[in-house]
């Protein structure tokens, strides 16, 4: 290649390089423009997004303000004694007041206690003058408690000692006296206003164990609460839980102490607020309680009983005040089919009022002794207890007062 050819070849190379450099510049400019365009687009998009978000926040703020305004307009007007939160002077000058917690009103119940009720007879008695004969003759279950019904329906709870059985069993036990009545005799109690019966006594099994079970079944079916032995009961009386316990002492004496302790604890565990213990104890025809009666009664009070009553002597005994609680040692007979003409017809209805406030017994010293006769006929037993009046009432009250004075010396 000569020099001229070399020069031409060099010029072509320089020309190509200039041509390529120009193209590169164009490409670079295009890339730059595209980059700028993208960047500007991003800026515009970000600005639009920010504006949209600001608009949304503004709308939400307006909506919230509108809701608050509506709530303020619908809020009940405060009374003049309320504190204005925006008025610091008023707020500082007014004392904050609090509403006291409501307390439960005291609730009082009156309980009536009566003694031995034998609704039936012994098959060996003269049936012409028996309890059953009067039932058939009167043909009215309401006859027997007719003269005391107003008292029993006016109280809150009436409790009796059910001295006998209600059964159709003929399995009479070998004993001097065995009492049974027809199961329909439950109507005597329901129509008379009796709500609960103690069954822990020496006549509850007169026709065998089945007669005892029958008596429970028929009484409970009639709506009458039963208790006694190891069967305690807790009744709801006007919202007050009343625990009922029946103890049969005649055979075991002081051997019943543990049962007293256990049964009282049992009704406590069931929430009893008032506890009544009914003892079948003592000596027949005796107006003076023995040492076993006193020991068991005091134990019951010490363990938490609020009232102790007794029966079995068939006559009245005194009332002792022990640790502020009442012990009625014997209520005597009441509606008693076990004797066609008892020589001592004196009896009573013992009433006590218990007041409970905020679940606690706060008062139990209101008592009422209503002297009665177990018969409304003086010459024989017509099995219809009645309230005594006048001199007879005063005589029985005086008797109870004398018996009680000896116990409270």
Where do the PLM segments sit?
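Acidic, metal/ion-coordinating pockets
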Residues: 2-12, 25-78, 87-409
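Acidic, low-complexity cytosolic linker/stalk segments
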Residues: 16-17
């Amino acid at each position: 290649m000569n020099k001229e050819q070399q020069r031409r070849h060099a010029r072509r190379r320089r020309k190509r390089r200039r041509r390529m450099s120009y193209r590169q510049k164009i490409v670079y400019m295009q890339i730059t423009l595209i980059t700028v365009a993208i960047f500007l687009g991003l800026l515009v998009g970000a600005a639009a997004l920010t504006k949209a978000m600001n608009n949304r926040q503004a709308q939400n703020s307006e909506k919230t303000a509108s809701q608050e305004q509506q709530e303020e307009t619908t809020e009940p007007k405060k009374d003049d004694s309320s504190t204005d939160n925006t008025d610091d002077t008023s707020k500082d000058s007014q004392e904050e007041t609090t509403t006291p917690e409501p307390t439960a009103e005291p609730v009082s119940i009156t309980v009536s206690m009566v003694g031995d009720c034998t609704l039936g007879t012994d098959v060996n008695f003269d049936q012409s003058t028996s309890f059953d004969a009067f039932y058939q003759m009167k043909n009215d279950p309401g006859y027997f408690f007719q003269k005391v019904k107003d008292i029993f329906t006016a109280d809150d709870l009436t409790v009796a000692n059910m001295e006998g059985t209600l059964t159709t069993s003929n399995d009479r036990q070998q004993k001097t006296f065995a009492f049974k009545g027809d199961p329909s005799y439950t109507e005597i109690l329901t129509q008379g206003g009796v709500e609960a019966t103690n069954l822990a006594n020496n006549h509850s099994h007169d026709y065998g164990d089945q007669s005892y079970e029958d008596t429970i079944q028929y009484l409970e079916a009639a709506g009458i609460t039963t208790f006694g032995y190891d069967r305690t009961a807790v009744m709801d009386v006007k919202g007050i839980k009343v625990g009922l316990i029946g103890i049969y002492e005649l055979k075991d004496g002081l051997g019943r102490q543990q049962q007293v302790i256990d049964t009282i604890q049992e009704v406590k565990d069931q929430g009893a607020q008032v506890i009544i213990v009914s003892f079948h104890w003592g000596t027949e025809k005796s107006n003076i309680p023995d040492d076993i009666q006193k020991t068991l009664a005091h134990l019951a009070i010490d363990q938490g009983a609020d009232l102790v009553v007794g029966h079995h002597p068939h006559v009245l005994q005194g009332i002792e005040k022990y640790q502020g609680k009442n012990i009625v040692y014997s209520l005597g007979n009441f509606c008693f089919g076990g004797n066609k003409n008892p020589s001592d017809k004196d009896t009573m209805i013992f009433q006590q009022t218990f007041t409970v406030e905020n679940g606690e017994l706060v008062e139990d010293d209101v008592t009422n002794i209503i002297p009665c006769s177990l018969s409304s006929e003086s010459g024989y037993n017509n099995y219809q207890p009645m309230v005594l009046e006048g001199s007879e009432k005063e005589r029985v009250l005086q008797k109870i007062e004398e018996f009680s004075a000896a116990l409270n010396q």
